[in-house]
């Protein structure tokens, strides 16, 4: 088995999908989890205004609405959380995403004060954060807020991770990567767009340039610029296509380098890191 085949198998990626079937698969998956643990009453997700959170949010709201109708349990709710750092540059996209999702409840938690307070506490301890590490601090603060909300609403935190993100480890460890349940796992980036198109999402929400927008020194840095490859390259790789060897090597390099992000904390029984 080649490394490409190994990666495709590990991430559950497929070269072709039926969008309607995958929508139903994700919604049923979320419903089944909540039905298995009936003490759970909410799904919680941060909404950024980008493709991934818009899709995960819509699927979550659909799951909650169906389950509420099927069970008669009106305590069930989907909570969309806005988590700006100060004022978000693409705030209108966030509002458009909320309008599309139609969540049961919307909360806004501005994380800037908490991030700055944490940075100051570290500074007083003699640690000065780099801009890159501060970006990770933002991602972790966002996740901390979501878990607090989930804890107070008997909920689980929904993730936005998908195959095209997982393969490169393009997420913050214990930040946006630290979630309870990931309904998009297996899909690549272009397949996520197909699901949103099938759901009637406004095109600008899934055709915009993807950006994590975590760094102050490089605001709105495109994901593709940070990775050195395009999402089309990554999707082609996940679909089993043959790529330019240099591009394939870059993608595989990211996969190997970030393997620790896709695993539980390393123990004496692990040897993947020796690869």
Curated annotation (Swiss-Prot):
It is an enzyme of class 6 (ligase). Mg(2+) binds at residues 52, 165. Keywords: ATP-binding, Ligase, Magnesium, Metal-binding, NAD, Nucleotide-binding. Pathway: Cofactor biosynthesis; NAD(+) biosynthesis; NAD(+) from deamido-NAD(+) (ammonia route): step 1/1. The keyword Chloroplast does not apply. Pfam families: NAD_synthase. Its EC number is 6.3.1.5. One of its GO terms (molecular function) is glutaminase activity. It catalyses: deamido-NAD(+) + NH4(+) + ATP = AMP + diphosphate + NAD(+) + H(+). Disulfide bonds: none annotated. ATP binds at residues 46-53, 160, 189, 211. Deamido-NAD(+) binds at residues 33, 140, 173, 180, 260-261. One of its GO terms (biological process) is NAD biosynthetic process. The keyword Ribosomal protein does not apply. GO terms for cellular component: cytoplasm. It comes from the Bacteria. Catalyzes the ATP-dependent amidation of deamido-NAD to form NAD. Uses ammonia as a nitrogen source. Homodimer. Belongs to the NAD synthetase family. HAMAP family: NadE_ammonia_dep. This is NH(3)-dependent NAD(+) synthetase. It comes from Salmonella typhimurium (strain LT2 / SGSC1412 / ATCC 700720).
């Amino acid at each position: 088995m080649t490394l490409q085949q190994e990666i495709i198998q590990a991430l559950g990626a497929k070269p072709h999908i039926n969008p309607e079937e995958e929508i139903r698969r994700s919604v049923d998956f979320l419903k089944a989890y909540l039905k298995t643990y009936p003490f759970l009453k909410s799904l919680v997700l941060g909404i950024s205004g980008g493709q991934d959170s818009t899709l995960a949010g819509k699927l979550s709201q659909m799951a909650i609405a169906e389950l509420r109708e099927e069970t008669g349990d009106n305590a069930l709710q989907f909570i969309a959380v806005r988590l700006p750092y100060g004022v978000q540059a693409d705030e209108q996209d966030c509002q458009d995403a909320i309008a599309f999702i139609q969540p049961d409840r919307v909360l806004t938690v501005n994380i800037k004060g908490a991030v700055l307070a944490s940075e100051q506490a570290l500074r007083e301890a003699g640690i000065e954060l780099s801009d890159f590490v501060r970006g990770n601090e933002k991602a972790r603060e966002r996740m901390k807020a979501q878990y607090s909300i989930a804890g107070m609403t008997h909920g689980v935190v929904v993730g936005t991770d998908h195959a095209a993100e997982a393969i490169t480890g393009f997420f913050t460890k214990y930040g946006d990567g630290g979630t309870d349940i990931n309904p998009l796992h297996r899909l690549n980036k272009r397949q996520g767009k197909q699901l949103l198109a099938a759901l009637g999402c406004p095109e600008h929400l899934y055709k915009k340039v993807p950006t994590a927008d975590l760094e102050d020194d490089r605001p709105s840095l495109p994901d593709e610029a940070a990775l050195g490859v395009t999402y089309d390259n990554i999707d082609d790789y996940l679909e089993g296509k043959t790529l330019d060897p240099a591009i394939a090597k870059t993608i595989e390099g990211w996969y190997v380098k970030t393997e620790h992000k896709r695993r539980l904390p390393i123990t004496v029984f692990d040897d993947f890191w020796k690869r």
